[in-house]
Amino acid sequence: MEFSFSLKIKAAKEDAWEYYANFEKWYDWEEDLKNITLKGKFETGSCGTMELEGMPPMEYQLTLVKPFEEFWDKTETPFGDILFGHQIIDNNDGSVNIKHTVILDSEDEQHLEFLKQVFSDVPQSIFILKNCLEK
């Protein structure tokens, strides 16, 4: 199962990428982020821990990192693996489309509510990112 949200932002892809590659900037656009760590560099295969408000710390792995284009991370849950995609699509006109995708590795209809809950703050976080980049 998969949900995505995309929004056009007046920014260079390099500026948008800084909000992903620099974990200190995650606190600017992830409102419920309490703590995030990364063991190693921001590159494919690196692992870390993320803690969101009201949730226990969760381990994640960066499964794909393409600088200035996209990164994906994976978190294991009792309902199946969750993949989070963060893409920067360059419009070659001084703007980019930021697209965040959440995929739950399950086809079980009972897990749909869980996926909806995980995805629920994604649109708002992209609007916050837009405000950060366009100010």
Regions found by a protein language model. Give the residues of each.
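A short, structured loop/turn motif at beta-sheet edges
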Residues: 10-14, 64-68, 87-97
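Glycine-rich portal/gate segments that line the openings of hydrophobic small-molecule binding cavities
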Residues: 37-79, 83, 131-135
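Well-ordered beta-strand positions in beta-sheet-rich domains
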Residues: 4-6, 57-59, 83-85, 101
